[in-house]
């Protein structure tokens, strides 16, 4: 316990430790192709569907349950989802991390936080579906960073980064184009959204400015109401998406 306190809480020891930790994680991510090369899920299909199969896996970003109407929020931020019959809502779910670069790789893999080191030895969701005979697409509205998200995404048959990322509806436009033109019968699409990341005002078109004022303002207490409006508008846009 004393070693933990020295390492994590006392300056400058914590700086040196975090530099070491970052370098170690970078090295593991850099070597991912080698350390996961022999991994297999041994996945296969036991039965064939009669028609075309299209599965869509959507990864949202920076979206809080407390700002969703479906979870009891007082504002109507989920007008479309609220009208869906037989919608399955998970109410007892926690993210394994509150940062994108830590949580999304876990979402894309079979690894949990308790076995985080296995992340660098196992392939992710695209590889699993590839083994089962699917053609896979990873379409992202975020720029590549060379981190574990991109490493896992490269296992997809097709990796597409939207140029000049703006609004997430571009992901659906790209997916529709592929569905209409690709001959594949078994398809998996993983769509990585920009979601509700700051600056909130830029995350949705003007016609989705349901709550106003929603000006593009700096983060400060005096702008809290405006920022909340813009954030809630971004949730509404995700609902439309």
Model-identified regions with their sequence ranges:
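Short glycine/proline-rich turn/loop motifs
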Residues: 106, 218-229
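Active-site-proximal alpha/beta segments of enzymes that process anionic O-linked groups
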Residues: 2-57, 62-218
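Surface-exposed cleft-lining segments at the edges of enzyme active sites
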Residues: 113, 160-164, 225-235
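Metal-dependent active-site segment of extracytoplasmic phospho-/sulfohydrolases and closely related
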Residues: 56-57, 234-241
């Amino acid at each position: 316990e004393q070693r933990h306190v020295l390492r994590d809480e006392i300056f400058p020891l914590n700086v040196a430790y975090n530099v070491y930790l970052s370098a170690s994680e970078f090295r593991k991510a850099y070597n991912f192709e080698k350390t996961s090369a022999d991994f297999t899920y041994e996945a296969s299909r036991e039965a064939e569907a009669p028609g075309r199969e299209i599965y869509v896996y959507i990864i949202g970003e920076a979206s809080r349950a407390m700002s969703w109407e479906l979870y009891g929020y007082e504002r109507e931020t989920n007008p479309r989802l609220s009208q869906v019959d037989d919608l399955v809502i998970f109410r007892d779910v926690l993210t394994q991390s509150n940062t994108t670069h830590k949580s999304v790789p876990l979402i894309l893999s079979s690894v949990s936080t308790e076995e985080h080191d296995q992340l660098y030895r196992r392939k992710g969701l695209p590889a699993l579906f590839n083994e089962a005979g699917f053609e896979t697409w990873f379409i992202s509205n975020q720029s590549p960073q060379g981190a574990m998200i991109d490493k896992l995404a490269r296992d997809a048959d097709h990796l597409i980064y939207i140029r000049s990322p703006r609004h997430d509806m571009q992901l659906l436009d790209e997916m529709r184009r592929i569905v209409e033109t690709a001959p594949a019968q078994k398809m998996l699409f993983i769509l990585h959204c920009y979601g509700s990341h700051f600056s909130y005002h830029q995350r949705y078109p003007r016609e989705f400015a349901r709550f106003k004022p929603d000006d593009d303002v700096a983060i400060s207490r005096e702008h809290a109401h405006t920022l909340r409006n813009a954030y809630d508008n971004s949730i509404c846009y995700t609902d439309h998406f």
